[in-house]
């Protein structure tokens, strides 16, 4: 939000837009036949614990399936996805499903599934 000289951010609106976009993407993928009900871990871009908790609740996924690096290392931006995955590698075993999630300022989102 803003213009060429100044960016202004409405954090609440960005949060709401990002969550809505993530849910829309989830629904579209489900309509196309993707079933993530048995995904073992959801590794997300971590801007805050509030955001992760809201996403988990909105998707109906237990928060325990969203490993966090944020409380220890802070917001490390998009690097949180591979960083958190690397921290969880000892918990993963062959055949486990991991969903990587990224949401960019409420404007874009992507998911990628890895079968370990």
Q: What kind of feature is each model-predicted range?
A:
Residues 50-53, 78, 107-110:
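Short active-site-adjacent structural elements
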Residues 12, 20, 78-81, 112:
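Short capping/connector residues at structural and topological boundaries
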Residues 1-70:
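Hydrophobic pocket-lining "lid/loop/helix" segments that shape and contact the acyl-thioester
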Residues 84-116:
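Conserved beta-strand-centric core segments of catalytic alpha/beta enzyme folds
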Residues 69-81:
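Active-site-adjacent helical/loop segments in soluble small-molecule enzymes
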Residues 25-26, 55, 81-88:
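Buried hydrophobic packing segments
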């Amino acid at each position: 939000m803003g213009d060429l000289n100044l960016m202004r951010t409405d954090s609440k609106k960005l949060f709401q837009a990002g969550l809505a976009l993530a849910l829309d993407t989830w629904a579209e993928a489900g309509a196309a036949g993707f079933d993530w009900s048995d995904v073992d871990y959801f590794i997300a871009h971590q801007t805050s614990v509030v955001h992760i908790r809201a996403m988990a609740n909105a998707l109906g996924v237990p928060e325990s399936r969203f490993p966090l690096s944020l409380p220890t290392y802070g917001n490390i931006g998009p690097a949180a996805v591979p960083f958190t995955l690397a921290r969880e590698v000892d918990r993963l075993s062959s055949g486990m499903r991991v969903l990587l999630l990224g949401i960019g300022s409420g404007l874009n989102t992507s998911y990628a599934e890895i079968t370990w």
